[in-house]
Amino acid sequence: MLLRNRFLLLLALAGLLAFLSLSLQFFSRWLPVSLQLKTEMQVFPEFPVRLIQVGQGREEGLGAKNRKRIMPEPLTEPPALNPLYEANLYCNTPGAKERSMEGHAPPNLKLLSVQVIIRHGDRYPLYTIPKTKRPDIDCVLEPGRKPSHPHLTDFISHMSKGVDTQMDGTLGSLPRLPNHILCEMGELTQTGVVQHLRNGQLLKEIYLKKHRLLTSAWTAKHLYFESTGKSRTLQSGLALLYSLLPNFDWKKINVKHQWSTIFCSNHCDCPMRNHYLEEEQRRQYNFRVKNSLLEKTYINMAKIVGIPTRQLRASNPIDSLLCNFCHNATFPCTKNGCIDLEHFKVIKTHQLEDEKERYEKQLYFKYALMATHPLLNQTANRMLRIAEGKKDELFALYSAHDVTLSPILSALGLREARFPRFAARLVFELWHDPEKANNHYVRVLYNGEDVTFQTSFCRDQLRSSKRPLCPLKKFSTFVQKDMFSSLNSTSYYDACHQRLF
């Protein structure tokens, strides 16, 4: 009798769960799209989900059903190439608390400096697909809208107070907050701001609270902040800085303007760098035209949109579609049909395969060595100065782009590193052994993962040693010598101006 009652109870619970599941999946289909997205995103606020549309509805009452199913993001990396998994990682949607290895070193070592290179956070597309409706994304910051952050309200308030700050060049004329109801092209979104508020909070817990890199008496000389001239990079850097140093004194902030996306400053004259970039672009073109499935996909998408295939390709549709994907917005529809998830998967898969071939051909690697040497040289020289006892620029922040970070990863020899996601961060730490005056070490971390021993300059270092750290000398030698030997040169100038024959 007892077993029978337990069976009936379990049966009733199963029925209730089934009813709730169906309600969660299908009740919101009668709501407006904007409310659908908000409802669905709040089902499990602490558990990131990706809403994949099963039947694409057409715009303007064309009558197709608009159902979605909930797919939990995988907790472990799938064994084979998975474009949706990779796209999820690229979106970097704020979710569960992130684990990181920043600041982890033997307890007897002292942290001397940290240099961080970031990619801006989530942004509105740089390109639109012709004859389609732009993604309906609001770039006005609203703390009550998800994703949000405990510091967001105070951050918004603090950004309106900085009349005394010093900003080079055109940076002073840029808005410090995204502020358009319908985002402008390339504008930072609220998601992008939150991503860097989270980055700053994480770095604060590690570097300020645990290692006391900057004390409460820090001054302008202890901080270095450089940004390109785009509002999305300036705003991303300010968001990270605010969470790192809440309610910072604007008088202590001096933002340097970098006109080049590769941060080459006064060393941008490099003909051979341009040559290898052109060769790499030629490789990309040849690889694309060999992909018959990709071409068929573009042809099909062009028919749906009603434009020539060449015009569709030129609009770089993956940029716009990634915005839809990352924000759980439906893909564009016209009277001829809808761009769907299969189109997206084909283009994203091609991107991933192109990255693999890029590594094999090594043209991009040669470009990367020359493109990144000025910035890596600045990074190494700052470490060497601090190792000698200087106390300036203990925390350096470069707010940049994917085209900044990607060649740095390549130049460092990080073969397994993924293409920089939104709000990606690359960190260089300098450590010192107080018991041995000349013992300085460097750690390299990418999105919280310790990749020091994946770099070409420290791959041969024994990780099983008592001190699993890479000597600073190895990094400085790499920058000052080894980068050029890979190019059959002895200096940056020679590498940039050598003849091909």
From Swiss-Prot:
Residues 28-501 are lumenal. It is found in: Golgi apparatus membrane. Its EC number is 3.1.3.-. It holds the Pfam family His_Phos_2. SUPFAM superfamilies: Phosphoglycerate mutase-like. It catalyses: 3-O-[beta-D-GlcA-(1->3)-beta-D-Gal-(1->3)-beta-D-Gal-(1->4)-beta-D-2-O-P-Xyl]-L-seryl-[protein] + H2O = 3-O-(beta-D-GlcA-(1->3)-beta-D-Gal-(1->3)-beta-D-Gal-(1->4)-beta-D-Xyl)-L-seryl-[protein] + phosphate. Residues 1-6 are cytoplasmic. The keyword Transmembrane helix applies. PROSITE patterns: HIS_ACID_PHOSPHAT_1. Signal peptide: none annotated. Keywords: Glycoprotein, Golgi apparatus, Hydrolase, Membrane, Signal-anchor, Transmembrane, Transmembrane helix. The chain crosses the membrane at residues 7-27. Glycans are attached at residues 328, 377, 488. It is a single-pass type II membrane protein. The active site is at residues 120, 402. Belongs to the histidine acid phosphatase family. Responsible for the 2-O-dephosphorylation of xylose in the glycosaminoglycan-protein linkage region of proteoglycans thereby regulating the amount of mature glycosaminoglycan (GAG) chains. Sulfated glycosaminoglycans (GAGs), including heparan sulfate and chondroitin sulfate, are synthesized on the so-called common GAG-protein linkage region (GlcUAbeta1-3Galbeta1-3Galbeta1-4Xylbeta1-O-Ser) of core proteins, which is formed by the stepwise addition of monosaccharide residues by the respective specific glycosyltransferases. This is 2-phosphoxylose phosphatase 1. The lineage of its organism: Eukaryota, Metazoa, Chordata, Craniata, Vertebrata.
